């Protein structure tokens, strides 16, 4: 009986880890839909340009406050990070908590699925705006 309980526990842990990895991977198509909330200010793709907010092409591996020609807030200039999935998720969950004084008015994405999906969508775009 004890071996059955251990087997059940091991299977539960394996399932939880697998489920967590599925969330972490993100779905670019779902992320594109969530990104519609961001399009009022941000752009991606071959014709993207800075507008109310910086364009987000090539965000994966890009230094913060580095979109050429965009006038970032002083707190954002001082952030000094390189964007990766973990940094993006921490920021987009609550932008004003991560960067007090940011000009970004968006309140954030509380859903970890939405965060992962938007990252999966954005990270498809290279610095030239073409999908990788």
UniProtKB/Swiss-Prot annotation:
Gene Ontology CC entries for this record: periplasmic space
Residue sites binding heme c per the record: 38, 41-42, 104
Main location: periplasm
Name assigned to this protein: Cytochrome c-554
Highest taxon of the lineage: Bacteria
Every Cytochrome c domain range: 26-126
Keyword Nuclease: no
Provenance organism: Methylosinus trichosporium
Signal peptide coordinates: 1-24
Gene Ontology molecular functions: electron transfer activity; heme binding; metal ion binding
């Amino acid at each position: 009986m004890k071996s059955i309980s251990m087997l059940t526990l091991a299977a539960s842990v394996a399932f939880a880890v697998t489920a967590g990895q599925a969330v972490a991977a993100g779905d670019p198509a779902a992320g594109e839909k969530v990104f519609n909330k961001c399009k009022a200010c941000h752009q991606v793709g071959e014709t993207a340009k800075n507008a109310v907010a910086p364009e987000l092409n090539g965000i994966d591996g890009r230094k913060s406050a580095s979109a050429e020609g965009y006038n970032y807030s002083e707190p954002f200039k001082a952030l000094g990070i390189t964007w990766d999935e973990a940094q993006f998720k921490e920021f987009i969950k609550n932008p004003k908590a991560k960067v007090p004084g940011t000009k970004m008015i968006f309140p954030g994405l509380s859903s970890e699925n939405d965060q992962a999906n938007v990252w999966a969508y954005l990270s498809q775009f290279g610095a030239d705006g073409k999908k990788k």
